[in-house]
A protein has these predicted regions:
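Cationic, low-complexity basic patches in intrinsically disordered or flexible, solvent-exposed regions
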Residues: 8
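N-terminal [4Fe-4S]-dependent radical SAM core
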Residues: 12-53, 58-116
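Long amphipathic N-terminal alpha/beta scaffold segment
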Residues: 104-115, 121, 126-133, 139, ...
Length: 222
């Protein structure tokens, strides 16, 4: 992952300013991403926009290294507008904690610093009501060794309530929002079944910037 920061570009020994370099400058240490699954689906898979998904996305929503979080019962309750019980919220938090433990175990031998980024990588990480996402994201950033929260999502799945939550969490620990631009060319976007025009992506970036939220752009080279 390339992190473009022209302010520090000349100070870097590499040909580009890497994420590793950015993490060391920002947090003073190396950190590893732990791939997590919030249990969400995607509008490009559940029939809202399409059922086939983007052509580059894997069967697990490209969250291949994350343990699957099966909380459909609780997710359906929030989509019906029901209030989650304390037991529901506790179940969500415990599921995330279990994923964090498993994720840390996978990289602990090579991660001497013991610092991590909680990365909700699978499917669309904000494609759920705030009442469902809040206990999940809060549990992810609770451990001291978690330096930041990173959420992969679509630009058409960032309503004001979601942005309010992310902005609130950003006051506790840095929040990054990873958006799949993939291409700026309409014909290619249609071919890969991205499911939204470039204008939607641009508008989402503007709204995230206005909230002080860091944006990571996913692009396909070639």
């Amino acid at each position: 992952l390339i992190c473009w920061d022209f302010q520090h570009r000349k100070e870097c020994k590499m040909e580009y300013y890497s994420l590793n370099e950015y993490l060391r400058r920002t947090f003073g240490t190396k950190a590893y991403k732990i791939s997590l699954d919030a249990g969400c689906s995607c509008p490009n898979r559940d029939g809202l926009l399409d059922t086939r998904g983007c052509i580059f996305c894997s069967a697990s929503g490209s969250g291949d290294f994350a343990e699957h979080l099966d909380m459909q019962r609780i997710l359906k309750k929030t989509k019906r507008g029901e209030i989650l019980t304390e037991a529901d919220q506790r179940a969500l938090r415990q599921a995330v904690q279990k994923q964090l433990i498993a994720g840390k175990a996978r990289v602990e031998k090579k991660n001497k610093a013991g610092k991590y980024i909680a990365y909700f990588q699978a499917y669309t990480g904000t494609y759920a009501p705030v009442s469902y996402l809040r206990p999940i994201f809060e549990a992810a950033i609770e451990p001291e060794e978690i330096l930041a929260l990173s959420v992969a999502t679509r630009p058409d799945c960032l309503d004001d309530e979601i942005l309010d939550l992310l902005e609130e969490l950003n006051q506790k620990k840095p929040v990054w929002v990873e958006l799949g631009l993939q291409t700026i060319h309409p014909a290619t976007a249609e071919y890969i079944r991205r499911g939204y025009p470039l204008s939607v992506y641009d508008a989402a970036v503007d709204r995230l910037n206005a909230r002080g939220l860091e944006v990571i752009v996913h692009v396909i080279l070639g």
